[in-house]
Amino acid sequence: MNSITKSYGSKFALNDVSLEIGPGKIVGLLGSNGSGKSTLMKMVTGLLQPTRGTLTVTGLPVGLKSKALVSFMPDRPLTESWMKVRDAITFFQEFYDDFDIVKAREMLQFMKLNESDRVSVLSKGMSERLQLTLALSRDARLYLLDEPIGGVDPVARGKILDAIVEYYNEDSSIIISTHLVRDIERIFDEVVFIREGEIVMHEEVENIRIKYGKSVDDMFKEVYAE
């Protein structure tokens, strides 16, 4: 991502953002609501086009070819209310050539989800577990998870974080957007702080602890209190 700007008239959703993520990293994209996190993710998936700047995934310009490399879990469910869990799995298997049905069923068991359950009766936490299962069961190079623990209880959060660590492909990278930093910082290798459409910090988690003597959550509070 090189010098990306996304504007709507005179309002900038992203302003001259440059970012490079290496393979094998779990990266936290941290910011308050409206900071530009979701816009950035949608641009990497190709759902939004930049006003200016260039975007690539493993060297490929973002477009039709790069979409096969990116698995996106948006902040709204990808499933329909009429579906059962098995219908959602079947839909993804038929739609994505890289969908691993064996991995999906293993994750369902880990998540304590039944294939016969109706999507419409799943709790918020169970629904998020299903969405994560669908996203991580693809053999992608980049996984984008938009607020995967937002609005779920602490038990569900723990299960979701454990699943991310257990099932993500270590040759790939994951970008996780969130504002719930304390609950999730334990799984991050790097963090990116975004505020008002601009990146204000990109740092390895260990460096934050050594250089600043702070947790990621403490640094987040400091940056956003300014």
List the model feature ranges, each with a label:
Residues 45:
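Helix-to-loop junction immediately C-terminal to a conserved catalytic motif
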Residues 52-66:
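Conserved ABC transporter NBD signature motif
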Residues 75-130:
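ABC-family P-loop ATPase nucleotide-binding domains
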